[in-house]
């Protein structure tokens, strides 16, 4: 199946965990993103609030320059958190400072 799986989100960096490395030496950075916005749904304004775990791999994880409390725009895709958990996790492919 070739379904589209693209996510773009402006969010607050709620928490950034220490960088770790896979057994193959790939850097991994796990973060928690917090988002709040007003969206239109069925002709009504709806307050959307969420927290979602996110992961950055490779060079971007090593070059991490953001801090807790910073706002960023992230782009990536959703995947299950782990082999044992079907909970969603945002796999970040691009991150940049949010400039409102």
Curated annotation (Swiss-Prot):
It holds the Pfam family SSB_1. One of its GO terms (cellular component) is pre-primosome complex. InterPro entries: NA-bd_OB-fold, Primosome_PriB/ssb, Prisomal_replication_PriB. Keywords: DNA replication, DNA-binding, Primosome. PriA:PriB complex-catalyzed duplex DNA winding is inhibited by CGS 15943 (CHEBI:131351); PriA is the drug target. GO terms for molecular function: ATPase activator activity; ATPase binding; double-stranded DNA binding; protein homodimerization activity; single-stranded DNA binding. SUPFAM superfamilies: Nucleic acid-binding proteins. Homodimer. Component of the replication restart primosome. Primosome assembly occurs via a 'hand-off' mechanism. PriA binds to replication forks, subsequently PriB then DnaT bind; DnaT then displaces ssDNA to generate the helicase loading substrate. Interacts with PriA with high affinity, independent of DNA presence. This is Replication restart protein PriB.
